[in-house]
């Protein structure tokens, strides 16, 4: 099942966020290789991301998101998608 994840970053944590970016990139790469992350889009000001993810359930997608180093700094919404 496909899900759209919309995540905003809390601006007060910029220094902490920047320090974790390399670990975040490595984890996203691993999730792409597993087929869990299909696409990732970042806003031009880097305050928001949209991720298309595959998962058996919304709970599974939530658990994968919680594995991201930047997850503690995110406000996340997960929306199930349906094909046209």
Predicted segments, located by residue:
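Conserved, structured core segments of small domains
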Residues: 1-84
């Amino acid at each position: 099942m496909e899900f759209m994840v919309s995540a905003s970053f809390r601006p007060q944590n910029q220094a902490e966020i920047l320090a974790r970016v390399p670990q975040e990139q490595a984890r996203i790469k691993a999730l792409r290789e597993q087929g869990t992350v299909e696409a990732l889009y970042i806003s031009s000001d880097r305050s928001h991301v949209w991720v298309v993810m595959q998962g058996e359930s919304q709970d599974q997608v939530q658990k994968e998101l919680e594995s991201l180093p930047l997850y503690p700094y995110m406000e996340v919404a997960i929306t199930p998608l349906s094909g046209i």
